[in-house]
């Protein structure tokens, strides 16, 4: 049986699928990355599953980074056609923008947060992450788009996950595992120093919380795919 296609838009090389990368083929998907701003992104439109990962740019940066406008248009096409799409962090923000919601500077979150599913979220894939703190790192946030269903919040940010048809968007980072984390702290060294983060303490938190988060994240992914 042929694998289905999973096309992933990646904004920086060190922000990849993390713990999801090995799991997606087991769930029946062949993964192909497209590099934002470099590759032709049109294959994303017709993929069986589209995933949009995070990155340091934002919806408000479209004037400097034309890929933002292109991605929003491609995502809108997929959402209008109810093609399964999964957005992570920036991916959530781009999905929200594609649905006409406001996206901009918001509450800065960095570290481990309890993701609090709504009553609707508790009967879907988001229930899988209710028991373990998940990793967050973002400064922008989105309002809930019209027609979307709110699935989860944190104490500080009201829209941490929503669904729209067969698509799912999450503001937190379920894909992060220890190897991904290590690439992130190297790639974001300047920002971490500027905001006074102790990398050894940050790493120790990952070592403590990472295994439970990865376990919950894989269950989230499996539940999402099973529901398509």
Predicted regions: what is each one?
Residues 176-228:
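Acyltransferase
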Residues 22-86:
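Flexible gly/pro-rich beta->alpha loop and the following alpha-helix that scaffold active-site loops
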Residues 78-102:
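Catalytic nucleophile loop
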Residues 99-181:
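Pocket-forming structural segment of enzyme catalytic cores
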Residues 9-11, 36, 90:
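Cofactor-binding loop segments of dinucleotide-utilizing enzymes, especially the Rossmann-like FAD-
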Residues 2-7:
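Extreme N-terminal starter segment of soluble prokaryotic enzymes
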Residues 15-19:
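Short N-terminal binding/cap micro-motifs at the start of the first secondary-structure element
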């Amino acid at each position: 049986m042929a694998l289905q296609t999973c096309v992933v838009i990646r904004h920086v090389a060190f922000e990849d699928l993390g713990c999801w990368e090995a799991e997606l083929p087991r769930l029946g998907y062949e993964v192909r990355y497209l590099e934002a701003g470099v590759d032709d992104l049109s294959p994303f439109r017709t993929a069986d599953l589209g995933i949009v990962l995070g990155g340091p740019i934002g919806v408000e940066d479209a004037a400097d980074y034309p890929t933002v406008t292109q991605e929003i248009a491609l995502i809108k096409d997929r959402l209008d056609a109810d093609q399964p799409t999964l957005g992570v962090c920036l991916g959530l923000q781009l999905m929200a923008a594609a649905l006409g919601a406001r996206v901009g500077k918001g509450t800065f979150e960095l570290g481990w947060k309890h993701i609090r599913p709504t009553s609707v979220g508790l009967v879907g894939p988001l229930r899988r992450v209710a028991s373990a703190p998940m990793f967050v790192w973002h400064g922008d946030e989105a309002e809930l788009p019209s027609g979307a269903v709110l699935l989860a919040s944190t104490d500080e940010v009201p829209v941490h996950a929503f669904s729209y048809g067969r698509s799912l968007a999450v503001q937190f980072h379920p894909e992060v595992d220890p190897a991904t984390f290590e690439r992130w702290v190297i790639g974001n060294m300047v920002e971490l120093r500027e905001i006074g983060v102790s990398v050894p303490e940050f790493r120790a938190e990952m070592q403590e919380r990472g295994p439970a988060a990865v376990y919950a994240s894989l269950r989230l992914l499996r539940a999402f795919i099973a529901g398509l």
